Amino acid sequence: MQLVDRVRGAVTGMSRRLVVGAVGAALVSGLVGAVGGTATAGAFSRPGLPVEYLQVPSPSMGRDIKVQFQSGGANSPALYLLDGLRAQDDFSGWDINTPAFEWYDQSGLSVVMPVGGQSSFYSDWYQPACGKAGCQTYKWETFLTSELPGWLQANRHVKPTGSAVVGLSMAASSALTLAIYHPQQFVYAGAMSGLLDPSQAMGPTLIGLAMGDAGGYKASDMWGPKEDPAWQRNDPLLNVGKLIANNTRVWVYCGNGKPSDLGGNNLPAKFLEGFVRTSNIKFQDAYNAGGGHNGVFDFPDSGTHSWEYWGAQLNAMKPDLQRALGATPNTGPAPQGA
């Protein structure tokens, strides 16, 4: 409270609500940065798993994109795992922090982990993504829904349709958005601990602050000013009716900021999970009010914004993913590229 009091005293002619809101925005930005930069488990895929490190051409982004891949067998559906705000350029956070490849080995699902995309929201940006490390083109939606599935079909025998996309934190809303606009490719969307109403209220401001902290990026380069229709297009709450109409299978998880024996007992992880929970509950309410009947909503009385909980959710959803995607578990060798 001392920080808030100092700011209140320093600013005149500004309402209490605006001052506290500004401080809250700055605080959330710092917390997002702190959480996004923490690798907890350091799992990495064990030696012996059939994990490949692919370089997939992306004409839309003008470079090759690194993809970690584990085959689920010929003509298998894919499970795309999307990373958080501070996605690294060397390995996916899913591999760094969870044994996801181990869990899904021989599952009948091809596991696809795109690497990179810090602060991207896995979206097609209006402008070049310019940050502290320079400028690059972000056309992640095009890559994930056109270039990558086409390449995987041709080179790794992966089905281009009937797949799943799962994202955490930043990528939770991205996963739902990709399923909204690409329902044939993604018949299943999993969202963990995300802000599911990003265009609402302080959402654009908070996202902009977080992106600035995580790489020095600008939200306006991504979706323009907050009045731009791109913000509404990428808002799962506003577009929940499309998920219902598509009968997309959804799995939405968010804790309440209280740690359990899984861990994550630190202030940033506790605060941020509690902060985003409200938008998840609003999303469930809108889904139910719209007549949705193909979803799993898990809002336990514990859970913080950390990998221990996201890993547990990914492991828990495995049977549901296999059922929904019609995966056939296999024990034979993975097919090699053409």
Curated annotation (Swiss-Prot):
Xref: InterPro entries: AB_hydrolase_fold (IPR029058), Esterase-like (IPR000801), Mycobacterial_A85_antigen (IPR050583), TAT_signal (IPR006311)
Keywords for this protein: Acyltransferase, Cell wall, Cytoplasm, Disulfide bond, Secreted, Signal, Transferase
Chain segments carrying region Fibronectin-binding: 101-111
Active site: S169, E273, H305
Catalyzed chemical reaction(s): an acyl-CoA + a 1,2-diacyl-sn-glycerol = a triacyl-sn-glycerol + CoA; 2 alpha,alpha'-trehalose 6-mycolate = alpha,alpha'-trehalose 6,6'-bismycolate + alpha,alpha-trehalose
Enzyme Commission number, as recorded: 2.3.1.122, 2.3.1.20
Gene inactivation effect: Cells lacking this gene produce normally mycoloylated cell wall components.
Signal peptide residues on this chain, from the entry's feature table: 1-43
Chief site of localization: secreted
Enzyme class, UniProt record, top EC level: transferase
Annotated compartments: Secreted, Cell wall; Cytoplasm
GO cellular component: cytoplasm; extracellular region; peptidoglycan-based cell wall; plasma membrane
Binding site for substrate: L85, R86, S169, D197, F275, V276, R277, T278, K282, H305, S306, W307
Disulfide bonds: C130-C135
Gene3D superfamilies: alpha/beta hydrolase (3.40.50.1820)
GO molecular function: acyltransferase activity, transferring groups other than amino-acyl groups; diacylglycerol O-acyltransferase activity; trehalose O-mycolyltransferase activity; zymogen binding
Subunit structure, interactors included: Homodimer.
Miscellaneous remark of the record: Was identified as a high-confidence drug target.
Function of the protein: The antigen 85 proteins (FbpA, FbpB, FbpC) are responsible for the high affinity of mycobacteria for fibronectin, a large adhesive glycoprotein, which facilitates the attachment of M.tuberculosis to murine alveolar macrophages (AMs). They also help to maintain the integrity of the cell wall by catalyzing the transfer of mycolic acids to cell wall arabinogalactan, and through the synthesis of alpha,alpha-trehalose dimycolate (TDM, cord factor).
Membership in a protein family: Belongs to the mycobacterial A85 antigen family.
Protein name: Diacylglycerol acyltransferase/mycolyltransferase Ag85A
Organism: Mycobacterium tuberculosis (strain ATCC 25618 / H37Rv)
Lineage: Bacteria, Bacillati, Actinomycetota, Actinomycetes, Mycobacteriales
Gene behind this protein: fbpA
